[in-house]
Amino acid sequence: MSTTASPATTESLQVLGLVGNPAPSSRTARVTQHVVALVRDALGPTGTAGDIVELADHGGDPSVQVAVGDAHVLVVATPAYKGSYTGLLKLFLDTLAGDGLRETVVVPVVTAGSPVHATMTDLHLRWVLGELGGSLPVPSVVLTERDLKAREDVADAVGGWRDAHLAGVVAAVQAVASSRSTTRSANDQALAGTTSR
């Protein structure tokens, strides 16, 4: 089954990776880059070049909030830290409005030392992303130290998630793009009605 987006979609679909690891050039960042590329490629011609934002470098930059608001797909990545996501990521998420991820498909990525820490971190992260209005249509990309050591190539480590869930991400993005288009059209009509009075 193909996971490429329908050609009927003409809107440019924004894919953004958000890395909450304070360490530069981390494995978490490499996994994020790969997942962003997978989603972008699966969206076909409508998928724009996915950007990666490392919050350690840009967390205080207001343009990051704007980019998050514009994204159709947000890949949110964190290493497990004491059974939860990092304080760096929390600080950024706290700056978003209560519905700051509404009409955004969110793919969490968790890297952890053990399966227990991975599960706890994933639960905490998915909860807060859902509270912010994000759509979480598929399971997270969860990788342990053992997963990453057993497969030198990140593509191999993410392969199982890709095969099982990438099509679900694409379908959800199509629904979000349609919803955004409908909302924008309704807002434009309402604005036109107001200005014509």
PLM features: residue spans?
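Short, glycine-/small-residue-rich phosphate/pyrophosphate-handling segment
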Residues: 106-154, 160
